[in-house]
Amino acid sequence: MEIQCPETCIHLAAAREHPAAVVKKQQERDVAALVPTIKHLTERQQQLFFLFHSVILRHKPEAFSRLLDEDVGQAAGAVAATLETAGRGVLYEHTPASLPAQRLARDMTAALAEIRARGTRIFDGEAAIALRAIEAGAREARKNPADDTAYLALVGRLLHARSQPAADEEVKPASSLILP
């Protein structure tokens, strides 16, 4: 039986503040896996790194496809290559090999354009460095052939991605649990 508690539930807050030992060990492993890919980034590049990860986590593959670590690496690499090429004065859009990676790359490019449209100044070089770090992290996670979504799971845990129902899905009613 599952109880649907709101985010403000005091019991959930206590569980987040004092996680179980297994959860704490997993968090330590996750941070240890991510640090090598971001240790060379500046603060601004780290912000872009996590911004692109939020785009990756929000991305919904179409139809029967699913997003894999390889797709994340291809998409990040292609967008980074496009930005690096533009920095040299050549307009050429690099394209990832897989269709899910192409769609993710399109979403990443759209997010970058949207942020720039709001007036935020983002240099192509900074964004490319952050994307190359994502590509390296996804490539490193692919070394474990048993799990082809290890990097996505890692990022989801670190960003505390909570599954939100889609707009067309039915929302379950809240729990009838009464707290004093």
What are the roles of these predicted feature ranges?
Residues A21-A111:
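Charged, low-complexity interaction segments
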